[in-house]
Amino acid sequence: ENEFTPMVGAFGGTMIDVSGSSSVRINAMDMEKGYADDGKNPLADKSEFIMSLFEQIMGDDVNARHRSIIDRCIKDLYSSYIAGGYHGKSPTLTDLYNMLRQQDEDEARELALSAELFITGSLGIFSQETNVKQDNRLTSYNILDLGEQLMPLGMLVILESVYNRVLQNWRAGKRTWVFVDEFSIFFRYPFATSYFLRMWKRLRKRNAYMTGITQNVGEMLRSKDARWLFANSEF
């Protein structure tokens, strides 16, 4: 509800207002070095994340052929970026969209058309290079005006953006605190729930500490995932 804007401003922080009508752009395909757990292939995790975005858009229509095409394109798009030591510009969803349209399979064109609204269309705020600074010691993401169409997708991308920032700090030897107000909202969206729980487990390995704040404990206790989270947390 935008309550933190005065406090963030008073402390010289950065407030990032994320909505379909704002000029803010956050690249859903940003990927920092150390993205995967030790010894794991970062492309496997990134491919899974991008598949989650398409599953959020297309629902149960995403099948094994769609997933194979996404995985193939992700490997191609990131190959030079990773080979270059994660320097330069990350690929974008626009790059992925263009590559999908170049594939031979009908399913690739289905993926491109289904995601068009969120890539080249009017809701494409996560399909371009990130244009906001996220390196302030105090950074707040405001999703008040995100809207129902963008909310499920936006939650995934913002969590991904926060995770990338945690990785930057971890590699620089810095500790990160992540506070999520009204975090019961995340448990209304299955894919956001899954990602949120994964972050809850992984951040401690990256010298980061995550705090969830909610007044709706009763609502959350109806969720099996939320009950697991409470059982593995301090109060």
Question: Which residues fall in each region the model found?
Answer:
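C-terminal regions of RecA-like/P-loop NTPase motor modules
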Residues: M220-F235
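P-loop NTPase motor domains
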Residues: G9-G13, V18-S22, N27-A208, G212, ...
